[in-house]
Structure formats: structure tokens, C-alpha cells
């Protein structure tokens, strides 16, 4: 598991640009707020009354956690590697989550082609090369090009899915801190639970929009 601070500046810039307007960072949509959120999150419009979504790749309901695979699996196993990258950053064990393939949406545009479209070697990180990649990325964002191919799945998703998972985890911790009165620095996560200093374990699936309190469980 990583954290947002440990992700490189280039990864952060490219990843956050791919997160449909930054909706993964400290915010969420739910069924009550969809009409006014303007988040651009394709998961927001289909949420149940007690479900939340932090970004286009994470949806949580009282019954399950759903992770979205935006690239089609055409035999290479990318349908598994994408949600596993999110799960690693969210502190989710393999298995206790549902994998769903993404529907059509500009939020899932393929950033992996940005390097290919720029006339520079991949190892070239000069200002000119970075500017060309940024321009290519902006062009891809505007076109909303959502496709699988060219061995682009991991280059496209590795950074932004890590950021999406880490941001969802930190948002859950912040919510637990607000509702428990415990400083967020004293809260940790493990195996799909937020854990308070006294050992109280709060399942991620208990996260709701306006609960009076988290439902808690002990070890």
C-alpha cells in the first residue's frame, strides 16, 4: 500500500488529470447529491439510496464494494489487475469485492496513449517532452477516447488507479475521524476496515452519507 505523498509529481499530475476533474480527492457522490454534484462520475447516476462513490472506479454499498475495470479483458488478465491495483491502495484483501467492467464514459479515456502520441522517447523527461505529453493527454481527455489495445492497460491505469484507491481510503479515514472524534492521524485501515485506536473496526461498507454514527464491531 502506498500513499498520495509517495506518488511522484508526474504520476500525480497525469493521474489526477485522468480522474474526471479531481473527484477522487476528498469527496464523494451519493444518491441524494447526484443532481447537484456535477462531478462527471459515471457511477453517480446509478447509485442506490445508501451507496456512495468516490471516483469512477470505487462504489460502496451496505452489501458490497464494487471496483471498476475500465479496460476490456481480451485474454491478458487485465480484468483482474485493474481492481487489484485499487484494492491494494484501499487496504482491501483480494476476493471480498465485486469487479465490474466500465460502461462507456469520457471518464475512462485512455491516458496510456499520451506517451505514444508524443514524438519523444519514453525515458525523455525534458521540459519539451513533458509539454508534448501534456498536450497529448489534454487532446485525449477532450476526445474521451476509451479503448483497450496496444498494451496500454497498465501504463494507462497504474498511476490513476493507485491515486483513486489511496484517495478513497483517506476519505474513509477522514469520515471516521469526523464521526468518532478521533484524529485522522491515529486512524489506520486494514482488510476493508477503518480501525480506531481502541481497536474498534468499522467496515468500509458501513460508510453512508448521513448516518448518526458508524456501526462498530470488535475483533
Question: Across the structure, where does each feature detected by a protein language model lie?
Answer:
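Hydrophobic h-region of N-terminal signal peptides that target proteins for export
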Residues: 21-25
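Catalytic phosphate/nucleotide-handling subdomain of diverse soluble enzymes
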Residues: 90-91
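N-terminal secretory signal peptides and thylakoid transit peptides that target proteins
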Residues: 2-20
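C-terminal segment of N-terminal export signals and the immediately downstream linker at the start
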Residues: 5-6, 26-62, 189, 194
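Alpha/propeptide regions of enzymes that mature by internal proteolysis
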Residues: 159, 163-167, 171-179
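Short, surface-exposed loop/turn segments at secondary-structure boundaries that line and modulate
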Residues: 2, 65-85, 95-166, 184-216
Amino acid at each position: 500500500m502506498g500513499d498520495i505523498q509517495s506518488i511522484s509529481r508526474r504520476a500525480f499530475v497525469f493521474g489526477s488529470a485522468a480522474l474526471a476533474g479531481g473527484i477522487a480527492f476528498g469527496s464523494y457522490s451519493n444518491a441524494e447529491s447526484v443532481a447537484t454534484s456535477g462531478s462527471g462520475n459515471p457511477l453517480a447516476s446509478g447509485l442506490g439510496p445508501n451507496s456512495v462513490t468516490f471516483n469512477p472506479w470505487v462504489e460502496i454499498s451496505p452489501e458490497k464494494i464494487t471496483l471498476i475495470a475500465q479496460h476490456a479483458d481480451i485474454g491478458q488478465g487485465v480484468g483482474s489487475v485493474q481492481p487489484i491495483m485499487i484494492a491494494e491502495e484501499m487496504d482491501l484483501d483480494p476476493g471480498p469485492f465485486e469487479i465490474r467492467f466500465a460502461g462507456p464514459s469520457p471518464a475512462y479515456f485512455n491516458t496510456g496513449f499520451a506517451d505514444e502520441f508524443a514524438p519523444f522517447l519514453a525515458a525523455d523527461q525534458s521540459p519539451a517532452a513533458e509539454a508534448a505529453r501534456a498536450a497529448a493527454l489534454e487532446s485525449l481527455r477532450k476526445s474521451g477516447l476509451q479503448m483497450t489495445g496496444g498494451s496500454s492497460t497498465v501504463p494507462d491505469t497504474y498511476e490513476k488507479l493507485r491515486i483513486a484507491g489511496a484517495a478513497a481510503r483517506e476519505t474513509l479515514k477522514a469520515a471516521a475521524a469526523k464521526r468518532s472524534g478521533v484524529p485522522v492521524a491515529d486512524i489506520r485501515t486494514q482488510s476493508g476496515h477503518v480501525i480506531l485506536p481502541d481497536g474498534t473496526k468499522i467496515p468500509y461498507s458501513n460508510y453512508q452519507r448521513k448516518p448518526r454514527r458508524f456501526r462498530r464491531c470488535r475483533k
